[in-house]
Amino acid sequence: MKRTAFFISDGTGITAEALGQSLLAQFEFIEFEKITLPYIDSLEKARKAVARIDKASEIDGNKPVIFDTIVNSEIRAEIRKSQGYMIDIFGTFLEPLEQELGSKSTYTVGKSHSIVSNSSYNRRIDAMNYALENDDGARVRYYNEADIILVGVSRSGKTPTCIYLALQYGIKAANFPLTEDDILDQRLPESLRSYREKIFGLTIDPERLAVIRNERKPNSKYASIKQCNYEVEEVELMYRRERIPYLNSTDYSVEEISTRIMMMTGIERHIR
């Protein structure tokens, strides 16, 4: 089944996307075409958005799902005229919150993002630069600055997790790929041993690893199920021998991997 989902906002659309994506992810047997419409901050833009929604409804034969974070009530009312099923995020939550707090909302466009301090922004950028500069074992001499060092076989999810930890939490995360020689030795590489307390391992089901590697190097030894089985078995054995905490990333999104790592290690987020 195919449905269209619109994320509509009078700002960047990040909040509508974040909540909408989380809800849609619960319906794994439905294919969603996702469309973000940011800065819908006038009635004219709202009418154009309605036209797109109605066209999608006609093509799909189903109502598009609309997630909106529009502050202006007139613009929201205009969007509501469309042939879509509208989930009004601010309207749903602000009114009961106003009643509970005994205070009216200021209804400020883009407020959720304007409150981020300069220090948080700088921390996020520093962590992101660190993740990129210390990707794939490139610069181990800066590992003393790391909050965490992810290790694992090639294509087990290290890089996207490091980037997410940096962007979302301001965590400085480096990653180091464990080669066939490393896992054959069954010891941490020499360059990592002085940072043992920062090391966290990722693993992955061999079948999933083979699929991912075949996208990169199809029909190669590197992507064969035999090679993937071997590397995963050996790296998990090394984790246990070296007493390295680790997580199987197969069934988790990068958001879930990051959250579980923080829970397992006790690392605190640096930005909020």
Swiss-Prot record:
EC number, as in UniProt: 2.7.11.33, 2.7.4.28
Annotated positions binding ADP: G152, V153, S154, R155, S156, G157, K158, T159
UniProt catalytic activity: [pyruvate, water dikinase] + ADP = [pyruvate, water dikinase]-phosphate + AMP + H(+); [pyruvate, water dikinase]-phosphate + phosphate + H(+) = [pyruvate, water dikinase] + diphosphate
GO MF: ADP binding; ATP binding; phosphotransferase activity, phosphate group as acceptor; protein serine/threonine kinase activity
Top-level taxon: Bacteria
Keyword terms: Kinase, Nucleotide-binding, Serine/threonine-protein kinase, Transferase
Main EC class the enzyme belongs to: transferase
InterPro entries in the cross-refs: Kinase-pyrophosphorylase, PSRP
A Pfam family annotated for this UniProt entry: Kinase-PPPase
Family: Belongs to the pyruvate, phosphate/water dikinase regulatory protein family. PSRP subfamily.
Function: Bifunctional serine/threonine kinase and phosphorylase involved in the regulation of the phosphoenolpyruvate synthase (PEPS) by catalyzing its phosphorylation/dephosphorylation.
Protein name per the record: Putative phosphoenolpyruvate synthase regulatory protein
